[in-house]
Amino acid sequence: MSSVSIVDYGVGNLLSVARAFQYFDASVNLVSTPEEIMSADRLVLPGVGAFEDGMKGLTTLNFIEPIKQFARSGKPFLGICLGMQMMLSRSTEFGQHEGLDLIAGEVVSVPSHGVDGQLHKIPHIGWNELVSTSEGEDWCHTILKNIPLNSSVYFVHSFMAMPSNPKKRLADTLYDGQAISAVIKDENMYGCQFHPEKSGEVGLSIIQQFLQI
């Protein structure tokens, strides 16, 4: 049986994430100590809300260094929504805030308009398609294995991750033509801007692939 540890730091939809992994009979642990993070087989960092609040939650519980050490260990790591954004170096959300710096880059606001110049709704909420990126790696040996191009997943966000190295962008989505990082990857580390636990069969397939790494 595969096991996965989900970081419990007071910010995130832990139960829905846990249920998605339990669908595949995974052993799910909600971890609330640095020691539990370090002993995990696979680690998931979920999160909803503001970047600053998320980082404060991790700092208060002394989770910053254990998460960094886990990420460097080579074991599978997945950030979801805010959890993905915190993987980057910094965020410009309501000021300048330092992130975990697992992947070099910055979190910036989603463009307020499409490529045609027309204003669109922020936050970006709803189903949108996954598309390949020009410089990212092939999906066949990643958590997107078996995911067809243009599969739809569920987004809820006002900010987006911009890795410094475009090769770290595994998949994008297009919001009125504006490219947004949907999945980022650096070796053992993955981040999903969308919510796989709310994305139907496509999301469940991604979770299943993460359990098989």
UniProtKB/Swiss-Prot annotation:
The active site is at C81, H195, E197. GO terms for biological process: L-histidine biosynthetic process. Gene3D superfamilies: 3.40.50.880. Residues 3-213 form the Glutamine amidotransferase type-1 domain. GO terms for molecular function: glutaminase activity; imidazoleglycerol-phosphate synthase activity; lyase activity. CDD domains: GATase1_IGP_Synthase. Keywords: Amino-acid biosynthesis, Cytoplasm, Glutamine amidotransferase, Histidine biosynthesis, Hydrolase, Lyase. Its EC number is 4.3.2.10, 3.5.1.2. SUPFAM superfamilies: Class I glutamine amidotransferase-like. One of its GO terms (cellular component) is cytoplasm. Pfam families: GATase. This is Imidazole glycerol phosphate synthase subunit HisH 1. It comes from Legionella pneumophila subsp. pneumophila (strain Philadelphia 1 / ATCC 33152 / DSM 7513). The lineage of its organism: Bacteria, Pseudomonadati, Pseudomonadota, Gammaproteobacteria, Legionellales.
